[in-house]
Curated annotation (Swiss-Prot):
GO biological process, one term: translation
Family as reported in the entry's similarity comment: Belongs to the universal ribosomal protein uL5 family.
Example of a GO MF term: structural constituent of ribosome
Protein name: Large ribosomal subunit protein uL5
Subunit structure of this chain's protein: Part of the 50S ribosomal subunit; part of the 5S rRNA/L5/L18/L25 subcomplex. Contacts the 5S rRNA and the P site tRNA. Forms a bridge to the 30S subunit in the 70S ribosome.
Keyword field: Ribonucleoprotein, Ribosomal protein, RNA-binding, rRNA-binding, tRNA-binding
Organism: Chlamydia caviae (strain ATCC VR-813 / DSM 19441 / 03DC25 / GPIC) (Chlamydophila caviae)
């Protein structure tokens, strides 16, 4: 069992139940999955660059990314149907908790001028953020990076509100900006 999973089962569940007064233990929010995605439309023109970004995403997540493909052809964007335009990875279980632990303790402190993430969620218990650079991850070899590439990370929880979601993620180690 990972350190974060153990922390969740032993401490975080109890503190969430006390704070929000859940009558049933099944109401306590749980982290369901983490989705990491990259939009690689510019890199789609260069196959070597596209492959390099897929390898980077694979190193960051620990599993093979799924290539997302264009549904329609759009002549204005020089896009063809079925062309690879992005990549995503869905983390669940042990890998999810390991990534969350690494992200909170190693990656987020490496972000330049980091003062915490925004507390805005989607209103349904999910939280998303965008990163401008993949080089903050320790798995990435800086000498092999040809082009900086951003990514989106989404935490999907069973929380019903943004407050419950951000409280869960904050107790797990994600740092948020304090409200003024």
């Amino acid at each position: 069992m990972s350190r974060l999973k153990k922390l969740y089962t032993e401490e975080i569940r109890k503190s969430l139940q006390e704070k929000f007064g859940y009558g049933n233990t099944m109401q306590i929010p749980v982290l369901r999955k983490i989705v990491i995605s990259m939009g690689l439309a510019e890199a789609a023109k260069d196959k070597n660059l596209f492959q390099a970004h897929l390898e980077e995403l694979s190193m960051i997540s620990g599993q093979k990314p799924l290539v997302t493909k264009a549904r329609n052809s759009i002549a204005g964007f020089k896009l063809r149907e079925g062309q690879g335009i992005g990549a995503k990875v869905t983390l669940r279980g042990q890998r999810m908790y390991d990534f969350m632990d690494r992200f909170c303790n190693i990656v987020s402190p490496r972000i330049r001028d980091f003062r915490g993430f925004s507390m805005k969620g989607d209103g349904r218990g999910c939280y998303s953020l965008g990163l401008d650079d993949q080089q903050i991850f320790p798995e990435i070899d800086l000498d092999r990076v040809k082009r900086t590439q951003g990514m989106n990370i989404t935490w999907v929880t069973t929380a019903q509100t943004d407050v419950e979601c951000t409280t869960l993620l904050e107790l797990m180690g994600l740092r948020f900006k304090k409200a003024q």
